[in-house]
Amino acid sequence: MNIVQFLASFFYRIRYWLLWGSLLVTALVIYFTQFLPYSYTVNSSLYAGVTNGTNLDGSQLININSTFDNIINIGKSKNTLAKVSVRLLATNLVHGDEWKDNMYIQAKHYRQLVQILPKEVLALVDRSSLDKTVTNLMNYRKENSSNFVYSIFNRPYPFYSYNALNSIIIKRLGTSDLIELVYTSADPGITQNTLKILEDELLKAYEQLRFSATNSAIAYFEEQDRK
C-alpha cells in the first residue's frame, strides 16, 4: 500500500469524525461570535468655506490654517462634547423605544439607559418636544458627581461620555474647504446622530468665528476712514 492509498483509507475511516468535528467548530464559532459587539462607522463631511476669506493690505484677514485649527479644536473641546452629550441623551430619551430599534437608538441600548436613569431625570423628558427636553437637561446639569447628566459625561459610560465622544476623528481633507468627521460606536442610530449633533455645534461655532471676523473687517475699514 503506497502513501496515497494509506491516506485515502485513513481519511475514509475517520470521515464521520471530520464531518462532525467541522460542524462542531462551525457551531461554536457562530455561538461565540453572537456575543461580540457590532461596530458601525459613519463618515461625514462639513463644508467650511474658509478659503474665501478677504485680503486686506496684502495680508489675509482670516488665517486659513489657523481657522481650520480653531474649528477642529472647538469640535474636540470638552465644552462642545458636553453639549453633544446632553443633546444626544435628550434625543435618545425622547425617541427611544424599549422593544423596537429605530433610527435614533437600538432598543437594547435604550433599555440599558433607562435602567440607570434616575426618576428625577426621567421626569425632565418631554416626548413631544426635543428642544424642551434639551433645555430641561441643560438646566438640570450641575458640576456635581451626584448629578446624572454631569456624571454620564465625565465617567466611562458608552455613547455619552467624554471618552466615547473624544474618539470622534475631526480633520481637514487636504487643502480643501471640507472637514471630515469619522465616528464608530456600537449603535448605528447613535453613531449617525452623534455626528449630526456635532456638525450642528461646529456650524454654530464657525458662524461665530465668521461673525467675529466680519466685525474685525468693519472695524478695519472704519479705522481707515478716520485716517
Task: Identify the residue ranges that each predicted region occupies.
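Hydrophobic and amphipathic membrane-targeting/association helices
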Residues: M1-K227
